[in-house]
Amino acid sequence: MNKIESRHRLIRSLIMEKKVHTQQELQELLEANGVIVTQSTLSRDMKALNLVKVTENNISYYVINSIAPSRWEKRLRFYMEDALIMLRPVQNQVVMKTLPGLAQSFGAILDALELPQIVATVCGDDVCLIICEDNPSAIECFDKLKEFAPPFFFSK
């Protein structure tokens, strides 16, 4: 087992044994077990392990999120980071503009995700038209797809 795997195993074990409230607390627990990590390394580890903070009786602590993203969600995020040009709702549709040749890939991924808001996708070379039941469904679909867009994509 390499260094990263053993550190991940230790983090999982610490999270399951004890309610860890902060990243600093987790870092101190790791140090108490002989593992020194920087804050940035710990952040990457926490993301890789899919740790999320939950609140119970006004007390927050980390748990392992057992609902891991699907391979289709990962693929959508990857494509959106590399090939998304524009995304916007238009009445009961969402228009997705992509790099040339990739719209059909987006359509296939969206179809595989089976999002409840999407009735159908119609794709050309660089545009994927996402058809929804009604205007509110299109806004809901747009909001869901925005979650997969790269940070700051909509602040351009």
Curated annotation (Swiss-Prot):
SUPFAM superfamilies documented for this protein: C-terminal domain of arginine repressor, Winged helix' DNA-binding domain
InterPro entries according to UniProt: Arg_repress, Arg_repress_C, Arg_repress_C_sf, Arg_repress_DNA-bd, WH-like_DNA-bd_sf, WH_DNA-bd_sf
Pathway assigned in UniProt: Amino-acid degradation; L-arginine degradation via ADI pathway
Gene Ontology cellular component annotations, sorted alphabetically: cytoplasm
Key words, A-Z: Activator, Arginine metabolism, Cytoplasm, DNA-binding, Transcription, Transcription regulation
Any single GO BP term: arginine catabolic process to ornithine
GO-annotated molecular function: arginine binding; DNA binding; DNA-binding transcription factor activity
Annotated localization: Cytoplasm
Family annotation (HAMAP family): Arg_repressor
Reported function: In the presence of arginine, coactivates the transcription of the arcABDC operon, with other regulatory proteins such as ArcR and CcpA.
Membership in a protein family: Belongs to the ArgR family.
Protein name: Arginine regulator
